[in-house]
C-alpha cells in the first residue's frame, strides 16, 4: 500500500516519486547504509566550520542515518539536490516540520539549504574504537 506524504514542491521531485513507491520515514531508513561506525555528523560551511551537528544519540539516529546516506550519495556535499532528496526521505515528517517550525531542526536545515541554494559539506565523524 502506498503512503501519502506532503512533498516540498519542486521540479525534480516528480521524477523521484514516479521512479519508486512512496515510503514512510521508517521504511526509508531501512534502505539506508548503517551508521554504527559513527559518533555523529557535522554540517560545515565553506570554511570547514561546523554549523550544525547531529549526534549518534537516542532520538537523533534516524536523522544521522539519513544525513550519512546523503553524504555517501552526494560525495559529502549538501546542496539543493541533496536537500531535496533528504526531504523525500524524511517523508511524513516534512509536513510536521512545516506545521511546527523548530520542532525538526534537521528537516528545517534541509529546507533552508534548498530554498537558499546553499552549498555545505557533510562530515561523518568516526566513533572511537
Residue ranges of model-derived segments:
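A cross-taxon signal for low-complexity, glycine/charged-rich
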Residues: 1-6, 11-16
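Short intrinsically disordered terminal tails
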Residues: 19-20, 129
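N-terminal, charge-rich interaction modules
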Residues: 22-37, 52-57
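N-terminal, charged low-complexity regulatory/assembly segments
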Residues: 25, 50-54, 65-69, 97-100, ...
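A cross-kingdom feature marking charged/low-complexity
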Residues: 33, 38-49, 112-129
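Amphipathic alpha-helical interaction modules
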Residues: 42-80
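Short, compact, well-ordered microdomains
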Residues: 84-128
Amino acid at each position: 500500500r502506498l503512503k501519502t506524504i506532503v512533498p516540498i514542491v519542486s521540479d525534480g521531485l516528480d521524477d523521484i516519486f514516479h521512479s519508486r513507491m512512496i515510503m514512510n520515514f521508517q521504511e526509508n531508513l531501512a534502505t539506508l547504509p548503517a551508521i554504527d561506525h559513527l559518533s555523529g555528523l557535522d554540517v560545515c560551511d565553506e570554511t570547514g566550520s561546523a554549523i550544525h551537528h547531529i549526534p549518534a544519540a537516542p532520538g537523533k539516529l534516524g536523522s544521522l542515518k539519513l544525513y550519512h546516506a546523503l553524504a555517501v550519495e552526494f560525495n559529502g556535499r549538501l546542496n539543493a539536490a541533496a536537500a531535496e532528496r533528504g526531504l523525500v526521505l524524511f517523508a511524513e515528517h516534512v509536513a510536521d516540520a512545516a506545521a511546527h517550525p523548530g520542532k525538526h531542526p534537521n528537516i528545517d536545515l534541509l529546507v533552508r539549504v534548498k530554498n537558499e541554494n546553499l552549498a555545505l559539506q557533510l562530515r561523518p565523524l568516526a566513533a572511537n574504537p
